[in-house]
Swiss-Prot record:
Subcellular location: Cytoplasm
The gene coding this protein: cspH
Keyword Transmembrane helix part of the UniProt annotation: no
Domain CSD: 7-67
Gene3D superfamilies xrefs: Nucleic acid-binding proteins (2.40.50.140)
Taxonomic placement: Bacteria, Pseudomonadati, Pseudomonadota, Gammaproteobacteria, Enterobacterales
BP GO annotations: regulation of gene expression
Protein name: Cold shock-like protein CspH
Any one Gene Ontology cellular component term annotated for this protein: cytosol
Amino acid sequence: MSRKMTGIVKTFDRKSGKGFIIPSDGRKEVQVHISAFTPRDAEVLIPGLRVEFCRVNGLRGPTAANVYLS
């Protein structure tokens, strides 16, 4: 089950394509992979950007899916 949320990109490593998002509701940070972004948004991805995403339960804990810049 997914839940739509907003948050801020905490970290993002272009080499690995992985990072973390801090949810605006104060919950624990969630993992994000570059494949969760649209190609256009992935090009400008840097820490500090506000995003909208769906929080899903991944194999290694909370994960962000369907991520868009807001």
